[in-house]
């Protein structure tokens, strides 16, 4: 293999590829990236056996070839090279890297044992979404997935498509986050996708990117521009989350999102010891009193709101509340409640594409 490529181009490819490299694998070849040079194009493939990334770019290929090179070492080298042409030459498993007056010689590995990328057929369900919608939906739901490894179906984000609506759902047992976006697809689909894969892909694309999504029985493919990501689906049945959404509503509160969020975050400043992470809300007479109490001290703050229905006293894990509020971009939010023991729904005013449901914490009188 012999090729010439701009330093900034190879760094771009490496940064993308390293998002799927297995850093602590017992299989040495998984710590490497497969380089394939042919037809004046360089393709890099990386995998941790759960997620696979393929990314490519045009360059000057003088001799076709392929080889596996250690990701960490190669990445460290090319990122330190000057912005000049990088020559990459291989002979057998020997790798030569030349840029300006810098020369490096590495040991590579033959590509024969590198895992093949998953294959999806033209008959698999396929549709397109906007990069901005994908980025926002993952941001608005990913934080609510469970970290409990004994419940793998809740470790991922549930994707559910009905006709041209794609829904992102995350549950951890204490809160539920849902984000809806439009697609150009038609049909129904259900898949539990690994959160990490979705989050890594959103770091690769731009908001103005177009993303093609394709699903098989075992994998989902996300493709944008010159980059593809394959992710193995979590093969479990998801919870019937719609039952959770069906709740009676006796009180409806409208409040400025930023003022409410800032007040919750200020109350949380006294909860940093980690022993208590509780904020209390006393809602009545178009006012929300927000208080916290810990060994460090106490806080108390009032903010205005508009309330329909009876007032209520309710308490929450402060982090659960603030994470949901940070996911909302609107100026005002609507909070729907049914007393102090049932969960509340929070969603942007005049926007039903996102809803966040969180359980309260029972406290004594």
Language model feature labels by segment:
Residues 1-365:
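Structural preference for solvent-exposed beta-strand-turn elements
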């Amino acid at each position: 293999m012999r090729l010439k490529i701009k330093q900034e181009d190879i760094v771009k490819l490496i940064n993308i590829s390293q998002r799927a490299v297995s850093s602590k694998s017992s299989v040495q070849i998984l710590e490497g990236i497969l380089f394939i040079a042919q037809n004046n194009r360089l393709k890099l493939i990386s995998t941790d056996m759960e997620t696979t990334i393929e990314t490519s770019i045009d360059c000057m290929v003088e001799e076709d070839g392929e080889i596996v090179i250690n990701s960490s070492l190669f990445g460290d080298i090319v990122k330190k090279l000057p912005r000049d042409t990088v020559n990459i030459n291989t002979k057998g498993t020997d790798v030569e890297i030349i840029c300006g007056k810098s020369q490096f010689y590495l040991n590579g590995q033959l590509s024969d044992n590198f895992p093949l990328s998953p294959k999806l057929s033209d008959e698999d369900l396929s549709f397109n979404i906007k990069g901005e919608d994908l980025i926002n939906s993952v941001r608005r739901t990913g934080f609510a997935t469970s970290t409990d490894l004994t419940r793998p179906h809740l470790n991922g984000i549930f994707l559910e498509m009905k006709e041209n609506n794609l829904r992102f759902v995350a549950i951890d047992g204490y809160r539920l986050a849902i984000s809806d976006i439009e697609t150009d697809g038609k049909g129904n689909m259900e898949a539990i996708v690994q959160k990490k894969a979705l989050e890594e892909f959103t770091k690769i694309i731009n908001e103005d990117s177009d993303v093609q999504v394709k699903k098989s029985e075992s994998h989902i493919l996300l493709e944008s521009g010159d980059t593809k990501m394959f992710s193995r689906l979590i093969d479990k049945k998801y919870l019937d989350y719609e039952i959770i959404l069906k709740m009676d509503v006796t009180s409806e509160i409208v409040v400025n999102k930023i003022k409410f969020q800032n007040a919750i975050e200020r109350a949380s400043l006294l909860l940093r010891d980690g022993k208590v992470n509780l904020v209390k809300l006393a809602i009545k007479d178009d006012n929300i009193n927000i208080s916290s109490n810990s060994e460090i001290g106490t806080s108390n703050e009032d903010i205005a709101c508009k309330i329909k229905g009876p007032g209520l006293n309710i308490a929450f894990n402060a982090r659960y509340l603030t994470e949901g509020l940070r996911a909302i971009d609107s100026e005002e939010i609507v909070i729907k409640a049914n007393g102090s023991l049932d969960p509340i729904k929070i969603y942007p005013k005049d926007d039903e594409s996102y809803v966040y449901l969180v359980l309260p914490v029972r406290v004594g009188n």
